[in-house]
Amino acid sequence: MPIVMDMNMLLMLSLAFTVMAPASASSSRFTQPPQSQAIVENDAADFSCEATGPSGDLHYEWLHNGQQIGYDSRVLQIGSNLRIESVQREDAGDYVCIAASAASGARQASPPAKLSVIFLDAVTVQLLGSNRNELLLKCHVEGASGDEPLQIEWYRDSAKLSSWQNVELQQHRLLVRQPSSADDGLYRCIASNAAARVMSKQGYVYEHLASVAPGSTKCLPKLKRNQKMPESWGKQVFLCRGKRGGSTGMDQSQSLPPSPEGLRIVQGPNDKLIIKEGEPTTLSCLYELPAELQNQRIQLRWRKDGKILRHVELGDAVVPGLALDHGKDALVREDGRLVLHKQNGTLSFNSIIASDAGQYMCQIQLEGHAPVNSAPGALEVIEQLKFMPQPTSKNLELGALGKLHCKAQGTPTPQVQWLRDAANGSLPEHVDDINGTLIFRNVSAEHRGNYTCVASNSQGQINATVAINVVVAPRFSVAPEGPIESSEQGVAVIHCQAIGDPKPTIQWDKDLKYLSENNTDRQRFSFLENGTLEIRNVQAEDEGKYGCTIGNSAGLKREEVRLLVRGNGDGFITEESAGDGFLVTRAVLITMTVALAYIVLVVGLMLWCRYRRQARKARLNELSIKEAGGDQAESGKNTEQEPCLSKQRNGHGKSRTAANGDAQKSDDTACSQQSKASKKSAHIYEQLALPRSGLSELIQIGRGEFGDVFVGKLKASLVAAASPSDKDADTEKQHSNSENGSGASGASGCGSGSTTLSTLNEKRRSKTSMDDIEEIKEEEQPQEQAQSESTADLLVMVKALNKVKDEQACQEFRRQLDLLRAISHKGVVRLFGLCREKDPHYMVLEYTDWGDLKQFLLATAGKVNTATATSSPPPLTTSQLLAVAYQIARGMDAIYRARFTHRDLATRNCVISSEFIVKVAYPALCKDKYSREYHKHRNTLLPVRWLAPECIQEDEYTTKSDIFAFAVVVWELFNQATKLPHEDLSNEQVVQRSLANTLEWSVAEGTPDGLKEILLSCWLTNPKERPSFSQLGAALSKAMQAAEK
């Protein structure tokens, strides 16, 4: 069912798309799209529409059910808004607002807004079932109420019913359980909505069988003239069958005594009254009521065509049960045009309509007596000449049969004729006018033009002109054919070409989701002018069902094709190989048999070898224990204390290996404790080794996720002693492993190897512009200065791994270590080394003299006390803030090019030096200093106010989620870090709105106009629609140049 609904919505939006040219990247956005609404018939409806764009550049159009609206005195376009003065039922449907740019020609369609018309015509009571156990009635309503439910009321005689005892109300139904004589009466229902309140035309009379006595209806055989009824007939029971539409009983009024002579009608309605439609009129009913009858129960009624239209009580008491007659209809309904005056019995009409025509009679009835009736009077209405409904323009398909209706009402009946707006006014060939219906036998191009419908009678003549447009339904000249197979990294071409008049537009979708230049990768997806879709560098996620929808004002057509992506080494069985099925099956069976025999042989050999190894290993272990003594226990203890990062073993371990070479070889064969990847990782960590004695003046600044964080000093000679050739060789090897499929995972499990791309190769491959060449030179210059100043101490940040047995903390420690080890960029802090002689392990990182960026911003904003100056430093200028953001973007772009993600980008995790150089760092002081900026979600501390929705929803971290966080960093910069993002919301509320994709972002005050659009795009829900760091760097560079002017 959801797929069907999505398909209907797809076709509806495609219909609106047929009138639009493809939208460019600069297309407008709707700030106030039209809203769906329900309107009472004949009331006014207003649709608002407003889009962003240069003033005077946009103009608006409206579509109704995919057709352009023809405006008249009732349907008006006021500016960009649409107003319908008197809503009719044919106005119901979907309305779409089109905003078109006069400069670029781009056209944008709003989401459809639905108009529902509320009306109420007639109500009837239907019998669904009647037996001794239950009576079931239904209130059938002809009308519509939009989204609001109809209000149904049930009455028995004049008493309103509710669910009580044996009576149960079920929406439109009335159920009476175990009916008895107490349930006898006339059942009616009243339906009401915003349009009207209408009572059922026909009620249902229920009479319990046990209460009907033989002969109670006085149903006797018809006697001939002068024939007397035998006395025996009065004691017999006769079967009565009334005529169709009649009654088996006698009229109650015939069995009642006549009214007193003083009660009479002096003057009734005129014999015949002719009134024009829309004019007022009055029907007279003058009566005399004696004084002695003032306290009696008397009712005055007006009947139309024998049915009660209005009634009023004349006496001082209310007459129950006199409002309606059993077995007859009632026309009593709320209508402000009719007024019954109690003083003189006059019935007034404020405005006559055509349905008021009929025979009227005035009636007075005293309780228990027969009614007094006036002479009937006829009311004739001269109906105004008008079209019903108004003819509208229409599109006819070339070569098909077309019809255009024109109906008119009036007194006398008008004559309807069609004319063509031409020199002679005659209709073209193969076009006939039959009783006001224009029939086109075979629609051709010459039938295009304006046609006028003329209706005339004795009142005069009216006309309506409509436009006939001849269109050609869209059809495929080249339809998509499939399935289409493509290999990964290959090129897939899906053809779709269409012809028609007007020229059809082509819209592609994948798995019922629209594809356009805005929501696809432009480097891989190309929408050619002829409609063909080309996909370059095919990925596995591109596999799916692709649909091509073509359409114009004549209709829509759609074809689907499936794209299958074949990975390396994968294959598909096609229909061409179906004939060779038997040969393939036989080959598979033979292969499986040989493989099974080989497996059995190998398993047998393995079991035999394993038995021998275990026996030999047991003997050698006994010898090892005797020779090594307690060394083995000490080694095992150290191994247990360091589950994440292994240390190099010295002394006894080496001598034992030399003495028991065969035993060691046997152990490695039996069960290896370290993979090749972990050995290589241990080799890398040995290259990063720093002596703990080289650190001095350690001062704790906070606590992170896996341990304490310090600031201290490191001897520069230890850093200068490291060989750069070793690091280059190591990074070259990492690049080789990455190319062979090892990947560059940003985080791995404890004890597993992790490899990244070489920073050197990234520079050679990605830095091609003059800007990047200068960056490489700037990075090399500090290295030369560091070698010349090897005697000075370096300011460092030290992160300790205290939770050595926490697998999650260990994994995060390794991820940050691999991230900072792989990056060599002036915008990212440098990893100096790793101290692993004893617990806890220390990660030694570069630090700056001015510390973290957030505290610097707070100091310049005057929010913290500075110890080095008597007054607060001045706030940063816009150019300086842009320079900070630009440096952070350059650093994050380097992380992206190394195929890593940061996951916690914020001003608190960046550092700034006195030379105004900003670097991306990773203090992550989530336990104390910045604990209020983290929230525990799914048993993990997360910076939820900086995270993209997919990180909270699916724990999915990508470069696009770092771009989301970068936009929040820019928001912090222009707020001087004095506010938290969404500080009016709690952390739980931020998480809930992120999960529901309802968290709204806006740029900070003071943000340059040139950055607002690209920063807002960083916060889009779809990660594919967010920009890249290179695009952000280019935008920031332009903004810096504009700010300096």
UniProtKB/Swiss-Prot annotation:
Span of domain Ig-like C2-type = 26-116, 115-200, 260-373, 376-469, 474-564
Side Cytoplasmic, residues: 609-1045
Which residues bear sugar attachments?
344, 424, 435, 442, 450, 463, 518, 530
Membrane topology note: Single-pass type I membrane protein
- Give an example GO biological process: cell adhesion
- List GO molecular-function terms, semicolon-separated: ATP binding; cell adhesion molecule binding; protein heterodimerization activity; protein homodimerization activity; protein kinase activity; signaling receptor activity; transmembrane receptor protein tyrosine kinase activity; Wnt-protein binding
Q: List the disulfide bonds.
A: 49-97, 139-189, 285-362, 406-453, 496-548
Whether Nuclease counts among this entry's keywords is: no
Write down the superkingdom of origin.
Answer: Eukaryota
| Location relative to the cell | Cell membrane
Name this protein carries in UniProt: Tyrosine-protein kinase-like otk
Query: Lineage of this protein's species?
Result: Eukaryota, Metazoa, Ecdysozoa, Arthropoda, Hexapoda
Gene name of this polypeptide: otk
